[in-house]
A protein has these predicted regions:
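Short, solvent-exposed secondary-structure boundary motifs
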Residues: 10-13, 40-46, 66-72, 92-97
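Hydrophobic pocket/interface hotspot
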Residues: 30-34, 40, 63, 80, ...
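Intrinsic-disorder/low-complexity, polar/charged segments enriched in Ser/Thr/Lys/Arg/Asp/Glu/Gln
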Residues: 14-22, 60-62, 75, 101, ...
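Short N-terminal secondary-structure initiator segments
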Residues: 55-75
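A conserved amphipathic terminal alpha-helix motif
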Residues: 120-155
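Hydrophobic ligand-binding cavity/cleft-lining segments
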Residues: 1-58, 144
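Hydrophobic-ligand binding "helix-grip"
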Residues: 68-112, 120
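Short structured motifs
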Residues: 4-5, 16-17, 48-50, 62-64, ...
Length: 155
C-alpha cells in the first residue's frame, strides 16, 4: 500500500500479455464463436461453469461470469462490446479482477482468420500473481481456452 496525504492508494498487480492465433475458418464464423458469451457455458463449460446475462443494448452486454483458468477461479461482472466480425472487447467492471481488459481483434487472412489478443489482468488481494500462479502458467491456461475455441471454429 502507498499512503499519501489524501489517503491510501492501492497497488494492484497487472499481468499483461498478448497472443496470436491463426484459425482455418472464415472471420465471420470465428467471430460468432469467440464473441458468443451467452453460449460459453454450453460450448466451453470447463472454463465458464456459469454465465448470466444482466443486460444487452445493441452490441454491448453486461454479463456475470464464473471463469476458471487452471488454478485461477474468478467470479466477475464484465461488459462485452462487439464490433461485428472485427473486434470483441471485454471490460471487467466488478469482482476481484475489476479493471481488467481483454481485446480480441479478428483479421481476415488467406488461410482463414488471425486473432490478435491483448490481455491486461488486474488481480487484488489473495488473487495476486505469483501467489496463485505465475504469468507463464496463466498464459498457458488462456492458450488452452483459445485452443478449445479454435477446435469449435474449425469443425
Amino acid at each position: 500500500m502507498i499512503y499519501t496525504h489524501v489517503g491510501v492508494v492501492s497497488k494492484i498487480p497487472l499481468t499483461a500479455f498478448s497472443l496470436e492465433k491463426i484459425i482455418h475458418a472464415k472471420r465471420k464464423d470465428v467471430f460468432k464463436i469467440f464473441s458468443n458469451y451467452d453460449d460459453y457455458e454450453k460450448l466451453i463449460p470447463q472454463y465458464f461453469p456459469s454465465i448470466r446475462i444482466r443486460s444487452v443494448r445493441g452490441n454491448t452486454a453486461v454479463v456475470e461470469e464464473h471463469l476458471k483458468l487452471g488454478d485461477l477461479e474468478l467470479v466477475l461482472m464484465s461488459k462485452h462490446v462487439a464490433t461485428p466480425f472485427v473486434l470483441h472487447e471485454v471490460y471487467v467492471i466488478g469482482g476481484k479482477s475489476k479493471g481488467s481488459y481483454i481485446k480480441q481483434e479478428f483479421v481476415e487472412i488467406p488461410e482463414g482468420t488471425k486473432i490478435l489478443i491483448d490481455v491486461n489482468l488486474k488481480l487484488t488481494g489473495l488473487m495476486k500473481i505469483p501467489k496463485v500462479l505465475d504469468k507463464s502458467k496463466l498464459i498457458e491456461n488462456y492458450s488452452n481456452l483459445l485452443n478449445d475455441l479454435t477446435i469449435l471454429c474449425e469443425n
